[in-house]
UniProtKB/Swiss-Prot annotation:
Residues 41-139 form the Expansin-like EG45 domain. It comes from Dictyostelium discoideum (Social amoeba). The keyword Transit peptide does not apply. Residues 460-476, 484-493 have a biased composition (Low complexity). This is Expansin-like protein 7. Residues 1-19 form the signal peptide. Residues 497-516 have a biased composition (Polar residues). The gene is expl7.
Length: 553
């Protein structure tokens, strides 16, 4: 019985190994949301989900920006959200006039989206994703299109395990194979003026990672045709030490910058009035607008929530500028589900603008959170203005699960830490400040991606004030980006990829310490931070790497 049990376990492990998807790129940043399943053909022309050529219900619609004129039809991607991960096959695209096209967008069917998010109506703005092999069963298949003729042969090719590089056809009377043309879908066409296709014809489909399969066509019958096999997914030398899955990608640093940035809302706030998210009547130096509202009594609070949640391990805290119409002694900042451990400033909020830093070590939190709260605990109505709300990037953010410093030379992977920059969208480097100077100076740095970069959003960090309140203890602290990993990948499909996967920076999990009391009253002043020329060069190289990585997908 013990031998039988061991045999069953071994067979199970083998089956699991063969059924799991193989990572083909590093982790990157995108956006994911739910959509309805197609009941008829999408732009890839696979037909109904439950039809003979259908791809099933775990599928994705891409935005036009990422669809690449049909090149990604049939490719599989692992998409990660706050709940978990799913693997989907690309079957459709959404035009630029209908869907956002600044960065990769995955519109997932209900069966797929419920695997990454508990809220079917949410948008996961910081989804992680990577290209993987598909869990295809059986050989690659094809079907002749009904509008084909002996002068015009159109084939739908499906059930491929990895991406298709090319398709050729050689008729009975041809001296050499002819490349079929992709029709912005999973369909490929042969047509030559005045020439007929003579049967039998040989069709060869080549993989993006090397290797090919063949099939012989004897007629234009619309029966399902089977190739000689399926592509073999690369099992090694693609992504070394790949993590089990991608985590949520790093949120952009800016939460409020002259308005709430994309993905943030205040809808969970309570007991407030007169809210204005773009109040131009009062703002700190360097800004043009602030978020203003009246907090009404001791149970009132401003809660800022991010759709699709955010991962705290990329950051060490938040910072913001704030003032009130009267002295306010009862401000508390905390994560909504962890109210018993909070941060409060060492001195009351006054009628003058001041900058505050809240280290996450002062708060009890999980790896993934959805919001944070600014609460009023006094039995008064107080009008507050708040602006320049930013995450503070970890000073030592390094991606995990990829090559470390000792492996880089041999693996073709590079893991980079930017000591003086923070992590913006998709790992693009930007600067972060933990405080402001005591004068009315402004320090800011912005890194924005190019049109071919992974992310379109701009992560910016600024700090300005005429007075300084509670900031992180220990003086000026520089913040680091999550880094970009690039990979030299064998084959023509994916040569490089940028990583925005989970970081090893603290804090991780829940912190311990004082509860139910004012925490971290330490203060320090910091002067404006200046990038060295080497840091600027590193940031520039990161931007170039990110652009090349995404363009190669």
């Amino acid at each position: 019985m013990r031998l039988l049990g061991s045999l069953i376990l071994t067979l199970s492990l083998i089956a699991s190994a063969f059924s799991s998807s193989v990572p083909l790129t590093l982790c990157m940043s995108g956006r994911a949301q739910g959509t309805e399943s197609l009941n008829k053909s999408g732009s890839c022309e696979y037909g109904a989900y439950n039809g003979p050529t259908g791809p099933g219900t775990l599928t994705a619609t891409l935005n036009e920006y990422f669809y690449s004129s049909g090149v990604k039809c049939g490719d599989c991607f692992e998409v990660s959200g706050p709940k978990g991960k799913t693997v989907v096959r690309v079957v459709n695209f959404c035009s630029a006039g209908t869907c956002p096209s600044e960065r990769p967008l995955f519109m997932l069917t209900p069966d797929a989206f419920q695997e990454i998010s508990s809220d079917p109506l949410s948008v996961v703005y910081d989804a992680g994703f990577r290209k993987v092999s598909c869990d295809a069963s059986g050989p690659i298949k094809a079907q002749v299109s009904e509008d084909s003729s002996k002068y015009y042969v159109k084939l739908l090719i499906f059930n491929n395990e990895v991406g298709i590089q090319s398709v050729t056809i050689k008729g009975k009377d041809m001296s050499a194979p002819v490349t079929m043309v992709r029709q912005g879908s999973a369909q490929f066409v042969w047509s030559q003026a005045g020439k007929e296709m003579m049967f039998p014809a040989t069709v060869v489909v080549s993989s993006q990672y090397g290797g090919s399969v063949t099939m012989t066509m004897n007629s234009l019958s619309m029966d399902i045709l089977k190739f000689s096999g399926n592509f073999v997914a690369p099992k090694s030398s693609i992504i070394k030490n790949a993590p089990a899955s991608c985590s949520l990608s790093a949120s952009p640093l800016a939460i409020y910058q002259n308005g709430l940035t994309e993905g943030w809302n205040y809808w969970s706030s309570r007991s407030y009035s007169q809210i204005n998210t773009t109040d131009s009547s009062s703002h700190s130096v360097g800004s043009t607008k602030s978020l203003s509202l009246v907090l009404m009594g001791s149970s009132s609070a401003l809660t800022l929530a991010r759709s699709g949640d955010f991962e705290t391990t990329y950051f060490t805290g938040i910072k913001f500028n704030m003032k009130a119409n009267t002295t306010m002694s009862g401000l508390r900042v905390y994560f909504p589900n962890e109210q018993n451990k909070y941060w409060t400033p060492s001195s009351p909020i006054t009628t003058s603008w001041a900058t505050y830093t809240v280290p996450f070590t002062s708060l009890q939190h999980k790896t993934i959170e959805s919001a944070f709260t600014f609460a009023n605990t006094e039995n008064i109505n107080v009008h507050i203005n708040i602006d320049n709300i930013h995450f503070i990037a970890s000073p030592s953010s390094v991606t995990t699960g990829y090559a470390n410093g000792n492996e880089t030379a041999n693996s073709g992977l590079a893991t980079t830490t930017v000591a003086s920059g923070g992590s913006g969208a998709s790992g693009v480097a930007t600067s972060s400040h933990t405080g402001v100077s005591s004068s009315s100076s402004t320090a800011s740095s912005t890194a924005s991606s190019t049109a071919s970069s992974i992310a379109s959003s701009t992560a910016s960090s600024s700090a300005s004030s005429t007075s300084v309140s509670s900031t992180t203890a220990g003086g000026k602290t520089t913040s680091g980006g999550s880094g970009i990993s690039t990979s030299g990948i064998t084959g023509s499909g994916d040569s490089m990829a940028a990583s925005t996967s989970k970081t090893t920076s603290n804090p991780t999990g829940k912190t311990t310490g004082m509860t139910g009391s004012s925490i971290d009253h330490s203060e320090s002043h910091s002067s404006d931070e200046h990038h060295s020329s080497s840091s600027i060069i590193k940031a520039s190289l990161l931007l170039v790497s990110a652009a090349l990585a995404f363009a190669s997908l």
